[in-house]
From Swiss-Prot:
Keywords per UniProt: Disulfide bond, Glycoprotein, Hemostasis impairing toxin, Secreted, Signal, Toxin
Assembly behavior: Heteromultimer; disulfide-linked.
SMART domains: CLECT (SM00034)
UniProt-listed Pfam families: Lectin_C
Domain of life: Eukaryota
Record's protein name: Snaclec stejaggregin-A subunit beta-2
InterPro entries attached to this UniProt entry: C-type_lectin-like, C-type_lectin-like/link_sf, C-type_lectin/snaclec_domain, CTDL_fold
Carbohydrate-modified residues: 47, 78
Organism: Trimeresurus stejnegeri (Chinese green tree viper)
Record Gene3D superfamilies: Mannose-Binding Protein A, subunit A
Cystines in this chain: 27-38, 55-144, 121-136
Gene Ontology cellular-component annotations: extracellular region
Tissue expr: Expressed by the venom gland.
Amino acid sequence: MGQFIFVSFGLLVVLLSLSGAGAGFCCPLGWSSYDLYCYKVFKQQMNWTDAEKFCTEQHTGSHLVSFHSSEEADFVVNMTYPILKLDFVWIGLSNVWNQCNSEWSDGTKLDYKDWSGESECIASKTVENQWWTKSCSRTHYVVCKFQA
């Protein structure tokens, strides 16, 4: 009887870990998880406005990626570089110098910053935690994010 309970408990632990229930959330197929959020790199280049619209169409609550710590930015760099090599991805910031209270396109507060210049829209390098200002009409790759 004791062995049956032990085996049953072991199977339950395995099932919970495979289902994502142990972590409390599970991202859709093709999306990567970090700190209760889901992320996906898209190998398509588009301007900032089209990229933000594209992200909102990928999943409910999805927007261009926002960063709230250097660890989160490192996670995205580690996710994007193998796919895109040395390049830029749009992040969810635009027109930040025209606003008193800057926020990400997903509505969250701008509480982590890593600027490298000044312009209308912001792109992040795929090889380091560094943000670059770019004309919003330029085309770059897309990383979308939503809360799981």
